[in-house]
Amino acid sequence: MSQNLQLVIDTDVGLDDALALMLCLASEAWNEAKIHGVTCVHGNTCLENVCSNTLKVLHAAGRLDIPVFRGASESLVESPESRAEFYHGCDGFGDFQYPDAPDPDHHIQKDHAVSFLTKITSERPNEISLLCLGPLTNIALAIHMDPRFCTNVKEMVIMGGNIAGVGNITAAAEFNFHCDPEAAHVVLKSMKCPITIFPWETALTRTNISYRWRNDVLGKIQSPQMQLLNQAEAKVIARHYKDGWVQCDPAAAAILMRPSIASSKVTHYVMVELHGRHTRGAMVLDHINSQGKKHNVTIIESIDLNLYKELLLTAAKTNLSRSKIQKGQGEET
């Protein structure tokens, strides 16, 4: 268990990001973490939708006190032609009507996400853990803005990249890295802290939970967070019920919160392909040490699915509201 996790979440909130955010909120309710802020980035949908979706999650959890920052709206070099609306919906969050949605103009911080990232890490050097759930544009910009950022961050957990050439947006690339390959390249090349990567293939093969469990076990829990997620995922559940419920981002969050959930991991030196016609955005593992460089990431190969599901269930039952945390009672209700 990670004690006193000082956390910043960089995210492109869609469906699985929302569940990851809920896990982080539960960790704070259990007095295991402190969320210093959420930085929004383009990805699953446009930046404005991401900001709105983030606020909806925090509103449902009773945690609008957490600062939310508007970040990069497009990639460093070439923005993707399409987002992930085909899965997450036109608004990136299931296209359901959310009553009394928080007004971004009122709740989003005035500072830019990149300014916040460089500031919080300079004020708390070697204390901040970054959970990166979307394209890495904000992180790359923080590196360019303040090179000390590379050494000020304590650790990073990244959902992104692939290890066996299996893509989910192109034939060879994972979505987050494909959205901004140059940003992924800058981050993996420049950061000096430990980096853990939860890649697409691990999500695909190791977090494949049945929709029956999602719907009839997790989905039956009566809590504000599950009511929100049930509404947001209703169309996806109806469309993919016979398939597996593959959720990338909450697994990455779970590994940061409970490192023991990672049952198999390996270190590698990795690179990002920037020019390939068919492979742009793919993560390349240097299996034969052709670059002669030290390993720069730890890759999660497998997780303990039972521990992961237990964590999801416990978080789904937890009272996430700020009033509960202030009373020191963030346990199951």
Describe these PLM feature segments:
Residues 2-5, 23-34, 175-182, 194-333:
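Conformational coupling and interaction surfaces
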Residues 81-89, 170-174, 212-215:
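Short, surface-exposed amphipathic charged segments that create phosphate/polyanion-binding patches used
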Residues 44-49, 76-78, 162-166, 270-288:
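Short, mixed-charge aromatic SLiMs
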Residues 5, 48-123, 296-303, 311-317, ...:
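Metal-dependent C-N hydrolase catalytic cores
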Residues 2-55, 63-64, 95-208:
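Active-site histidine-anchored catalytic micro-motif
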Residues 53, 78, 102, 141, ...:
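Sparse, context-dependent recognition of short Cys/His-centered cofactor- or disulfide-binding micro-motifs
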Residues 68, 187, 253:
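A residue-level signal for conserved active-site and pocket-lining positions in enzyme catalytic cores
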